[in-house]
Curated annotation (Swiss-Prot):
GO terms for molecular function: ATP binding; ATP hydrolysis activity; ATPase-coupled transmembrane transporter activity. SMART domains: AAA. This is Energy-coupling factor transporter ATP-binding protein EcfA2. Keywords: ATP-binding, Cell membrane, Membrane, Nucleotide-binding, Translocase, Transport. It is an enzyme of class 7 (translocase).
Length: 290
């Protein structure tokens, strides 16, 4: 499902003394099936941009086109209901979205709300609980008796239960330890491929953006500063530093090695695996002297 922002502006508390412009002149397209990371310094407009993707916020001016749906300032909330089925949002702490007596009821809530028969909703719950890495035994339990990591997976299953075509992730690994973070990101990447989703990841982690995204959108002061592949966006560390961002540690190492040995390393070095291979090739060609 293609996503297009056309001259989007968003002003909080418009037409009041407290008016604050959060987005202006945002023009960007996300192709169907892409995995796109949105990065930017705190206050850059990332989260405001995200909330336009399923109509939680509507543009003050301009339009957001998501598939055949168009969101403008004139849309009524009821008109956005079909869109919210197509666009699933996983917030920073998705476990805070849990509220039902059992895990099964929580996962079934969304589908039942959209008219899915109860037996079909329960079948989906059984399928999804396994998809997010939990056993069916969990379905009968209270979500509040689970560990934090398990609760997060249950909440994600609830989002997936509506079978969204677009999955929006707002810092979904916040508060997790490194191992939990990696497991969660790998799960999202697997879901992206298996379900053929359009995935939009809002993140502060340049490493996650480099490793998983096909494209990166860089936000700065409420507008799109840059948009391209990870290799393109991380090519100029100084420009990113000027807007308060850094490149991944692997890219820093690559640039230091190029400067030290006066060579060009063809690999983008976006992941540890790419970097290890590039270093091995470099030292097989370069003689190192004290």
């Amino acid at each position: 499902m293609d996503i297009v922002f056309e001259k989007v502006e968003h002003v909080y508390n418009a037409r009041s003394p407290l008016a604050r412009r959060a987005l202006y002149d945002v023009n960007v397209a996300i192709r169907s099936g892409a995995y796109v990371a949105v990065v930017g310094h705190t206050g850059s407009g990332k989260s405001t941009l995200l909330q336009h993707l399923n109509g939680l916020l509507q543009p003050t001016s301009g339009a957001v086109k998501i598939g055949e749906e168009t969101i403008t300032s004139h849309k009524r909330p009821k008109q956005l209901k079909p869109l919210r089925k197509k666009v699933g949002v996983v917030f920073q702490f998705p476990e805070h979205q849990l509220f039902e007596e059992t895990v099964e009821k929580d996962i079934c809530f969304g589908p039942l709300n959209f008219g899915v028969p109860e037996d079909e909703a329960k079948r989906k719950a059984r399928e999804l609980i396994k998809l997010v890495g939990l056993s069916e035994d969990v379905l009968a339990k209270s979500p509040f008796d689970l560990s934090g990591g398990q609760m997060r997976r249950v909440a994600i299953a609830g989002v997936l239960a509506l079978e969204p075509e677009v999955l929006v992730l707002d810092e979904p690994t916040a508060g997790l330890d490194p191992r939990g973070r990696k497991e969660m990101m790998e799960m999202f990447y697997r879901l992206h491929r298996e379900k053929q989703l359009t995935t939009v990841l809002v993140t502060h982690s340049m490493e996650d953006a480099a490793r998983y995204a096909d494209e990166i959108i860089v936000m700065h002061e409420g507008t799109v500063w840059g948009h391209g592949t990870p290799e393109e966006m991380f090519r100029d560390a100084d420009k990113l530093a000027a807007i308060g961002l850094s490149v991944p540690e692997t890219v820093k190492l690559k640039q230091q090695l190029e400067k030290r040995f006066g060579v060009v390393i063809p690999s983008p070095c976006l992941t540890l695996e790419q970097t290890a291979e590039a270093i091995q090739q470099l030292f097989s060609k370069v003689s190192v002297h004290d």
